[in-house]
């Protein structure tokens, strides 16, 4: 009964908004329609900027991994590369709503385009989030079980885990094609997605319980315990320094305290960014599916805030790795050296003089 009333209210609300804007669609952020160019300028700028950052950032990560063989010796690199490929595809997929904002007349089969786009980007974000959780588990095992880590985490098991992540992500959103509900608000740029494809409280709880909540809890649990271990190591080093203020302990403090402190700060940034970008989206997803809140502006902002995590991943997880930074620096030096050598070669090569009143091809 409440479901039917909510549907009727939304249809009436949308019909009244359509009457108000007459021939034009309303923009997602509610700033109205720009009738001069037939484009929602602000929304287009936001999506184009995010798309550029996501594609350029993850292309850099993938290129450095392929050009730096040392990175392949780290087990975390398997998940970082998988996450980079998934986030790169997120950026490429974001070109679809950009084109939709630039040209509202999408033609036939808008419902199919909306469903396919929503499904694909939901799967890619699921892979990215699952990789974040797997990276945290990998770091947790490396710190808590250092002696048996190489036996627990093998390349074969890592490949199987990555395959299972893709299969699980594809299956968990598949019921959206069978009328269970909308997997998210990524496709609400399309008119059909925003007005005709409604969310379902049961399907939302299904996704949150099987994907978002486990990933968030795993990240919180593992990094919290890693942070505790780092603090414990720092405390032990400080106690040893207080009891035995020798040169050996001073050297161990300089070699051990600073890395632990830096690692703890990296973990704090990782966890903070993860929750700041994903928690608003999850909360709004639950509230809107429960018919408590319906705000297109919040829907747009929380959705693209969560999608921006695809750019933050490549910045935090890659640039916090010292080996990756070394590979990036060497790659940059190689490219700069090749450019300088090419310019020097051009400067050294003698150029033939042109005769007056002559033509050269």
Curated annotation (Swiss-Prot):
GO terms for biological process: locomotory behavior; response to xenobiotic stimulus. Residues 1-44, 103-115, 181-205, 287-296 are extracellular. Keywords: Cell membrane, Disulfide bond, G-protein coupled receptor, Glycoprotein, Membrane, Receptor, Transducer, Transmembrane, Transmembrane helix. Disulfide bonds join 114-193. The chain crosses the membrane at residues 45-65, 82-102, 116-136, 160-180, 206-226, 266-286, 297-317. The keyword NAD does not apply. It is found in: Cell membrane. InterPro entries: GPCR_Rhodpsn (IPR000276), GPCR_Rhodpsn_7TM (IPR017452), TAAR (IPR050569). GO terms for cellular component: plasma membrane. Disruption phenotype: Gpr52 knockout mice are normal in body and brain weight. In the open field test, mice stay and move around the central zone significantly longer. The total distance traveled and brain morphology are normal. Mice are much more sensitive to the startle response following dizocilpine administration. Thus mice displayed psychosis-related behaviors. Mice exhibit a significantly higher istradefylline-induced locomotor activity. Glycans are attached at residues 2, 13, 20. Its main location: membrane. Residues 66-81, 137-159, 227-265, 318-361 are cytoplasmic. The keyword Lyase does not apply. It holds the Pfam family 7tm_1. It is a multi-pass membrane protein. Expressed in brain, especially in striatum. Expressed in the striatum, nucleus accumbens, and lateral globus pallidus. GO terms for molecular function: G protein-coupled receptor activity. Belongs to the G-protein coupled receptor 1 family. G- protein coupled receptor activated by antipsychotics reserpine leading to an increase in intracellular cAMP and its internalization. May play a role in locomotor activity through modulation of dopamine, NMDA and ADORA2A-induced locomotor activity. These behavioral changes are accompanied by modulation of the dopamine receptor signaling pathway in striatum. Modulates HTT level via cAMP-dependent but PKA independent mechanisms throught activation of RAB39B that translocates HTT to the endoplasmic reticulum, thus avoiding proteasome degradation. GPR52 is located within an intron of RABGAP1L gene, which exhibits epistatic effects on GPR52-mediated modulation of HTT levels by blocking this modulation. This is G-protein coupled receptor 52. It comes from Mus musculus.
């Amino acid at each position: 009964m409440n479901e039917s009333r909510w549907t009727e209210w939304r249809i009436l609300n949308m019909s009244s908004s359509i009457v108000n804007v007459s021939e034009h669609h309303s923009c997602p952020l509610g700033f109205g329609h720009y009738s001069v160019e037939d484009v929602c300028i602000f929304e287009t700028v936001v999506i184009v900027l995010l798309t550029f950052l996501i594609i350029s950032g993850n292309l850099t990560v993938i290129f450095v991994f392929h050009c730096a063989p040392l990175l392949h010796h780290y087990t975390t690199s398997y998940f970082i590369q998988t996450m980079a490929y998934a986030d790169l595809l997120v950026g490429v997929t974001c070109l679809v709503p950009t084109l939709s904002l630039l040209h509202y007349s999408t033609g036939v089969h808008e419902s199919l385009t909306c469903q396919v786009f929503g499904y694909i980007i939901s799967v890619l974000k699921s892979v990215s989030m699952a990789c974040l959780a797997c990276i945290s588990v990998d770091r947790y095992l490396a710190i808590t079980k250092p002696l048996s880590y190489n036996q627990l985490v093998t390349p074969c098991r890592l490949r199987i885990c990555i395959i299972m992540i893709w299969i699980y992500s594809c299956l968990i959103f598949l019921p959206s094609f069978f009328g269970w509900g909308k997997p998210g608000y990524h496709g609400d740029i399309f008119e059909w997605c925003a007005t005709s494809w409604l969310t379902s409280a049961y399907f939302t709880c299904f996704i949150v319980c099987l994907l978002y909540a486990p990933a968030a809890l795993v990240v919180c649990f593992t990094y919290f315990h890693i942070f505790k271990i780092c603090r414990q190591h720092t405390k032990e080093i400080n106690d040893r320094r207080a009891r035995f203020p020798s040169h050996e302990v001073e050297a161990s403090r300089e070699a051990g305290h600073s890395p632990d402190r830096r690692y703890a700060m990296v973990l704090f940034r990782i966890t903070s960014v993860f929750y700041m970008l994903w928690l608003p989206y999850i909360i709004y997803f639950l509230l809107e599916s429960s018919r408590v809140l319906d705000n297109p502006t919040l829907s747009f902002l929380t959705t693209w805030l969560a999608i921006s995590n695809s750019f933050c991943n490549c910045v935090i997880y890659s640039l916090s790795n010292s080996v990756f930074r070394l590979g990036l620096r060497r790659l940059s030096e190689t490219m700069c050296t090749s450019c300088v050598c090419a310019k020097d070669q051009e400067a050294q090569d003698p150029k033939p003089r042109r005769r007056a009143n002559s033509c050269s091809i």
